[in-house]
């Protein structure tokens, strides 16, 4: 018989740098999960993606065991990295903070495709372009 799921916890943590401090500790501690063990597992699986924010979906079972699935980094983080900026524009309609090429947008869309609500690359590219526009990052040819 399958284990009974008690909770599904979603967190966005920096790759390779999960610690028992908030937000990890309180989120997992109240469910009785071994926090240190989760941090070690997460850090081991994300060590190669250092510097990126990696969302994780943790499924906690009745016997206090857990499994977790790593998601792709947020599009805004990937766009900011590609454009070489720290954060998006405070006023994206008037101020552009950087730009990315169509090829970079396509690569980001390819990376994000498993987590987006589309199966087509063309639709994923349009989603990423919309995110770039809302961040004040221009898309050039």
Curated annotation (Swiss-Prot):
It comes from the Eukaryota. GO terms for cellular component: chloroplast; cytosolic large ribosomal subunit. Keywords: Chloroplast, Plastid, Ribonucleoprotein, Ribosomal protein, RNA-binding, rRNA-binding. PROSITE patterns: RIBOSOMAL_L11. Its main location: plastid. The keyword Ion transport does not apply. SUPFAM superfamilies: Ribosomal L11/L12e N-terminal domain, Ribosomal protein L11, C-terminal domain. GO terms for biological process: translation. Forms part of the ribosomal stalk which helps the ribosome interact with GTP-bound translation factors. Belongs to the universal ribosomal protein uL11 family. PANTHER family: 60S RIBOSOMAL PROTEIN L12, LARGE RIBOSOMAL SUBUNIT PROTEIN UL11M. This is Large ribosomal subunit protein uL11c. The gene is rpl11.
């Amino acid at each position: 018989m399958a284990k009974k799921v008690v909770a599904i916890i979603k967190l966005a943590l920096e790759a390779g740098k999960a610690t028992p401090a908030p937000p990890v500790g309180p989120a997992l501690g109240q469910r009785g999960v071994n926090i240190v063990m989760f941090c070690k597992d997460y850090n081991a699986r994300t060590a190669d993606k250092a510097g990126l924010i990696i969302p994780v979906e943790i499924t906690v079972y009745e016997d206090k065991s857990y499994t977790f699935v790593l998601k792709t980094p947020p599009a805004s983080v990937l766009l900011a990295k590609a454009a070489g900026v720290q954060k998006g524009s405070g006023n994206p309609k008037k101020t552009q903070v950087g730009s990315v090429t169509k090829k970079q947008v396509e690569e980001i869309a390819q990376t994000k495709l498993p987590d987006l609500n589309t199966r087509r690359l063309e639709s994923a590219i349009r989603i990423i372009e919309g995110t770039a526009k809302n961040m004040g990052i221009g898309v050039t040819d």
